[in-house]
Amino acid sequence: MKDGFLGIDLSTQQIKAVIIDQNGKVVHTTAINFSTHEKLKKFGTENGVHKNGSVITSPVIMWIEAIDILFNDLRENGWTDKLRGISGCAQQHGTVYWKNGAENSLKGLDESRSLAEQLEMCFSVQKSPIWMDSSTEKQCQELETFVGGDQEMAKLTGSRAHHRFSAAQIKKIVDEKQDVWKDTEKVSLISSFFASLLIGKYALIELTDGSGMNLMNIKTENWHKPLFDFISSDLESKLGTLVHPMTSTGHVHSYWTRRFGIPSDCTVLPFLGDNPSSLAGLSLLPTDIGISLGTSDTVFFFTPTFEPNIDAHVFSHFAPNSGYMAMVCFKNGSLTRERARNLNNSSWDKWDKIMKKTPAGNDNYIGFFFDEDEIVPRKPKGDYTFECSEEELKNKHPEKFARAVFESQCLFKLLYTQKMGFKKSDCSRILVTGGASRNTVLLQILSDVFEMPVCTIDVDGSAALGGAMRSRYVHSKTTKTYSQYYPCDNVSLACQPISANVEVYSNLFKTFKSRFDEFIKQ
């Protein structure tokens, strides 16, 4: 391989790397799990996080140690000296708080010592609030009141105020921990925090992740300064300016060259949020829907115009002159599916046998299943069933419970895709990524519910892949647009809708919507 381009995804449960060559072919993938890796077990996380009621965090130093481990692995396997570009992404919305003087430590990194050794004391907040946190209801209400309500916040920033969004999380620290705030020199998103490590100075926040903070004017793509002043008079100086996601942030710091052998002219692009990076990795066409099936489930698609919706999000697009990315995020994804599997004492490779015990439509057994407080709809955790009690469904009919979970998740995705205004065409497809994209039963239900073919990408991890693809694109200096350069040819057809099931789900969807409308009013 002559030239390599590295994409990295710092997600909730793991850090994942994908390397592509000069032709765009995936040549290497690797992943490190935060909770199960021998060197990271000491942090005591469960699925990468610490939970204390509605407060959900991850240790910053755990991420840094994982990055150390990842790059040691890449060096030992002979990949680092071939890298020409690096980019990537991180779980969206989470914030990292650098102590006063921390940038000096970044600039002076010593190649004889690990990152963790040198940066452990550089953070005023040791455990970063992440996207799963729901402890900021008070701050959300105050922010929305300030701008004139949830609809006005959505018109201004692309989303109503959400618990996990950075504005509410920052305001909570300003309100409750003034001493910590005074000791904070810089606030990074997790994405710009990662880029900062690579370039040896504070990296700027880029537009796609910046649009997921409730602080950026989505139309002008500039910070909304009245919101800054409402939170804290010094917030603007601690966040810095915004940068376009396809603009180079410079080359790797000499630390990475001397310690890991990365060429000194290796370019670093801004790191995105994981969902916009998945959009880049999937190379979606305007007629496609992207669905990421992970700890959380997300549905996203390209939209040429800005249409605010309090139930969804609109983010800036990573590519110039490409409109917006519409998205809805469901907090309860893979962990709820795993609960259904465990209730049936099954493994995923035998899951189709469990699902075949019940028919499509589940004899009209419907439920809403939230292991954590849900984002959309904004409802507390719990199992909400209608045709029979939750306990009866789980104890007497675990197979019906399992199908109810899977079908409910798919029906929610259809409901909110319609709310976001997606227009289906004859050539529309669903492109699925994430850990559950290998679950053929789930993919078939999605296909039947949406009445669309479902495709998967050839490599697991579209978010990391998106970082590598963007890096290669910028390095090429091509005059083609991103979609021209990457014509979405790295996908495989997984399943087609089954006409008999389509009819069943069309009828079930009407009942589902009725149950949903009643549920929302409660």
UniProtKB/Swiss-Prot annotation:
GO molecular function, one term: D-xylulokinase activity
Transmembrane segments: none
GO terms for biological process, alphabetical: D-xylose metabolic process; xylulose metabolic process
InterPro entries per the UniProt record, alphabetical: ATPase_NBD, Carb_kinase_FGGY, D-XK_euk, FGGY_C, FGGY_N
Enzyme class, spelled out: transferase
PANTHER family: SUGAR KINASE, XYLULOSE KINASE
Protein name: Uncharacterized sugar kinase R08D7.7
Species of the source: Caenorhabditis elegans
Taxonomic placement: Eukaryota, Metazoa, Ecdysozoa, Nematoda, Chromadorea
